[in-house]
Each structure stands twice: as C-alpha cells, then as structure tokens.
A protein has these predicted regions:
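Conserved catalytic core of sirtuin-type NAD+-dependent deacylases
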Residues: 2-314
Length: 314
C-alpha cells in the first residue's frame, strides 16, 4: 500500500510529537494530590504489621514488579519518564505512519516480552493469594506475568500485550501468530535490535517505517491493535467496576512497584482514602500518593513481597 502525501509529510511531526510530549490521557494527572519532596520511609517490618492488621488486601501492581524479568520500568525515582512517550491512542488510529512505526518497534520489543518469566514479586503474590490474603490482584502491567506465575484472580487493567484485537470486528487473536507474520513480511527488520520498553515497544529509530508491512485483520480486513489500553484510551468500565467492588470488601489497598502517576491506577487510591481504608505502597522513589499514604516502604518490591509472604507463613 502506498502512503498518502499527508502520511509522509506527517513523519517529521510524528518524530517531534514523540520526542517532546509527555503521555496524558483524559484521566492522567486529574485531581492530583501534592507530592512532597520528603516523606518518612517505613521498613519492610512495618509492612508485615500492616498486612497483619489488614488481612484482606486489594493489591495493585506496576512496572516495578517486572523489572527483575528484564522488562524496563517507565519512570525514575523522581517519577520522571525514562524514555520517549508511549504510543497515544489518537495517533495510532489516525496516522498510518504512526501505526507502521509502532508495529515495527513492537516486533523488536516482543522478543523481550515473550521471553520474560515471573519474578520473586510475582511468585510472592501467588503465595499470598493461596493463603487467602488477597481480595483481588490488579495489575497495570501488560506482560501477563501474574498469570504466568500462577495467580488465579487477576484484573489486567490495561490489557495484555500477548493478544491482538481488530478495531473493526473485535476479533481477538494471539500475538505470537501476528509476530510470525510480521517477521515473514519484514524479514530484514527481524534482524534489527533495540532496547525494549515496559509496554512491548522498542527504542528503534532512524528507519524508513513507511516500508514496514503491517497485515490487516484476516476476518474483516480491519485495523489491528495490541489488546492494551494506550494513553488517551479509556480503561473498560467493567474492569474499573470489578476493582471497585473488590476494594469495597477489602481491608486495605497495597500498591506494589508503581509510582501511581497515571490516573487509571491512582483512582483506586482516591477510592480507598474516600472510604477510610488505609493505603500502603512498596516502591523505590516518589509516588503520586505520598501525601495520603498510611505506609511507604522505599524498598525493592521483590525482596519486600517475598519477605512478607515468608513472614506470614504463605
């Protein structure tokens, strides 16, 4: 397929937008609470006391749970972006060059995602779930590692990168099958390498993305999209409702490995605070919720959760 002149002329605009903009959705940063520069840090021992006093936890996880699997996280200890902005929904659906660029980079990044295995954090949460300590496990990650570790009741808030959906007919298919077709259609691209990101993207630049061949849906010929929630796209209402229902029955909220900078996850901190439920965070560095936390453990999440599960006899 030939790209239109508008698509070709959009290349410089796309590069500028991707390098300059910070990802925001309609939800992002809404109703943000102040984030103080200093916050008293608690210890992993305090986490044990927190879990003992609140035996049924709603657990919300973020990228920090998967860094030990070789999947990078989004932000540094100050909550700032480590890499260029992730794909924006409106850009993906509205610009063919942007879609080609996304799938080219995703084809490279998929290698890291598909080979990742669960970390000690994932395994500790399986133990806690088996011991009846988790009311619901909610993850902002798209890597599927909680299920791979053996967790049974998981809400993938932002979807799963191992699934592809058609924006025309809604058909869902396995990403592995698409990966094989992308490699067959673009054999020379398969030889390239670049650093992967937490969303399955890769830092691939300075390529002629207009030449990357992306297949259409085999059912209706529609546009294919990874089955994940892009920035600027809404989390499905039924997922939010399921989390809120579980939070209502939980004793407290535990956040593991997330800075909570994106509102899709932070909203549940707001819900917990409004309901008078305590909130604990295990995360290295600053979080958006620091001003309202009951407990803040600035510690490696895998080490902290593994120790917690062991001390609880899980």
């Amino acid at each position: 397929m030939q790209l239109s002149q508008s698509d070709l002329s959009a290349e410089s605009e796309l590069r500028w937008l991707r390098s300059r903009t910070k990802p925001r959705s309609a939800d992002t940063y809404r109703n943000a609470l102040p984030m103080p520069e200093n916050h008293a840090m608690d210890s992993p021992t305090d986490l044990l006391d927190f879990a003992t006093r609140h035996p049924r936890l709603l657990v919300l996880t973020g990228a920090g749970c998967s860094t030990g699997a070789g999947i990078p996280d989004y932000r540094d200890a100050n909550g700032e972006w480590k890499r260029s902005a992730p794909m924006q929904f409106q850009l993906f659906v509205g610009n063919e060059l942007a879609r080609r660029r996304y799938w080219a980079r995703s084809m490279i990044g998929w290698r890291t995602m598909s080979q990742a295995t669960p970390t000690a954090a994932h395994r500790a949460l399986v133990r806690l779930e088996s011991a009846g300590r988790i009311a619901l496990l909610v993850t902002q990650n798209v890597d599927g590692l909680h299920n791979a570790a053996g967790s049974r009741d998981v809400v993938d808030l932002h979807g799963r990168i191992d699934t592809v959906c058609c924006m025309g007919c809604g058909t869902r298919s396995r990403r592995l099958a698409l990966q094989q077709e992308l490699s067959q259609r673009n054999p020379h691209w398969a030889l390239l390498d670049a650093r992967s990101g937490p969303d399955g993207d890769a830092d691939l630049e300075h390529q002629d993305f207009a030449r990357f061949d992306v297949p259409a849906c085999t059912v209706c010929g529609g546009m294919l999209k990874p089955d994940v929630v892009f920035f600027g796209e809404s989390v499905p209402r039924e997922r939010v409702a399921a989390v809120r229902a579980a939070l209502a029955g939980a004793d407290a909220l535990l956040v593991a490995g997330s800075s909570l900078m994106v509102y899709s996850g932070y909203r549940f901190v707001e819900d917990a605070v409004a309901a008078g439920k305590p909130v604990a965070v295990v995360n290295i560095g600053r979080t958006r919720a620091d001003a309202v936390l009951t407990l803040k453990v600035d510690h490696d999440v895998s080490t902290a959760l593994d120790a917690l599960a062991t001390r609880l006899g899980a």
